[in-house]
């Protein structure tokens, strides 16, 4: 029996995608209880830390050897990418468990709201861990739909109200996103699935600021080799904004502005050129189908 089996059996399945199942647990291990001899009283240790377990289950359509290899490679890189990002000052979930053989990675559960929810994109749907090309196609198709459909402004989300009560504007939020992405790309890691669903806003009472941006779900992350790799990461986010948040051009412009400042002109210039190329290819693809 794999070491992760008891953990998965204790967890509650909260999301399922094409590549992984996500479970929630109140803590990684059962909360210990201390009993005093000669007394019926007892007390528990400090409050447990809620965790998320992501299980990359076996793909029966793949050869077992290939499946085990790919699962191990992706899981290992995800764990290393999270550790490297955290070391560079990017706020990401803490990794608390890695079972390479079973394909399970455990992380702290982030309490807060996704940027998607805050900007009125609705509740989160299924999490699907899919290939980067499929992500781009799906995002682009949704973007086409939103371009021809005007959506009415909905009520303010709970997260947006909480930020407003702290004096935080949407513009400030966009700048924080841009700064977080710049820190990530400085590590030469690309996220691979940059959407507003994969960015959490966590309030930080007593911290240096009222909130922080937490980047989550590094299942498609990879090592960047060329400026175009960063440009594609940014383009996926741009199309996600257009798809989920109508009239978001100004918001995304704030993300890019702060991102460029964070990277510095020398590194930003080649990425900016490639981003324009990627946009042109995307528009051509939209027109030709």
Swiss-Prot record:
EC nos: 3.6.-.-, 2.7.11.1
Biased composition, class Basic and acidic residues, residue ranges: 140-152
Record InterPro entries: EcKL (IPR004119), Kinase-like_dom_sf (IPR011009), Prot_kinase_dom (IPR000719), Tyr_kinase_AS (IPR008266)
Annotated keywords: Activator, ATP-binding, Chromosome, Cytoplasm, Hydrolase, Kinase, Nucleotide-binding, Nucleus, Phosphoprotein, Serine/threonine-protein kinase, Telomere, Transcription, Transcription regulation, Transferase, tRNA processing
Reactions this protein catalyses: L-seryl-[protein] + ATP = O-phospho-L-seryl-[protein] + ADP + H(+); L-threonyl-[protein] + ATP = O-phospho-L-threonyl-[protein] + ADP + H(+)
Catalytic residues, chain numbering: 193 (proton acceptor)
Top-level taxon of origin: Eukaryota
Compartments where located: Cytoplasm; Nucleus; Chromosome, Telomere
Domain Protein kinase: 8-289
Transmembrane segments annotated in the record for this chain: none
SUPFAM superfamilies attached to this UniProt entry: Protein kinase-like (PK-like)
Residues binding ATP: 14-22, 54
Keyword check for NADP: no
Location of region: Disordered: 134-158
GO molecular function: ATP binding; hydrolase activity; protein serine kinase activity; protein serine/threonine kinase activity
GO cellular component: chromosome, telomeric region; cytosol; EKC/KEOPS complex; nucleus
GO BP terms, alphabetized: tRNA processing; tRNA threonylcarbamoyladenosine metabolic process
Similarity remark: Belongs to the protein kinase superfamily. BUD32 family.
Record's function text: Component of the EKC/KEOPS complex that is required for the formation of a threonylcarbamoyl group on adenosine at position 37 (t(6)A37) in tRNAs that read codons beginning with adenine. The complex is probably involved in the transfer of the threonylcarbamoyl moiety of threonylcarbamoyl-AMP (TC-AMP) to the N6 group of A37. BUD32 has ATPase activity in the context of the EKC/KEOPS complex and likely plays a supporting role to the catalytic subunit KAE1. The EKC/KEOPS complex also promotes both telomere uncapping and telomere elongation.
Assembly mode: Component of the EKC/KEOPS complex composed of at least BUD32, CGI121, GON7, KAE1 and PCC1; the whole complex dimerizes.
Domain notes: This protein is considered an atypical serine/threonine kinase, because it lacks the conventional structural elements necessary for the substrate recognition as well as a lysine residue that in all other serine/threonine kinases participates in the catalytic event. BUD32 has protein kinase activity in vitro, but in the context of the EKC/KEOPS complex, the catalytic subunit KAE1 switches the activity of BUD32 from kinase into ATPase.
UniProt-recorded name of the protein: EKC/KEOPS complex subunit BUD32
Organism annotation: Cryptococcus neoformans var. neoformans serotype D (strain JEC21 / ATCC MYA-565) (Filobasidiella neoformans)
Lineage, highest ranks first: Eukaryota, Fungi, Dikarya, Basidiomycota, Agaricomycotina
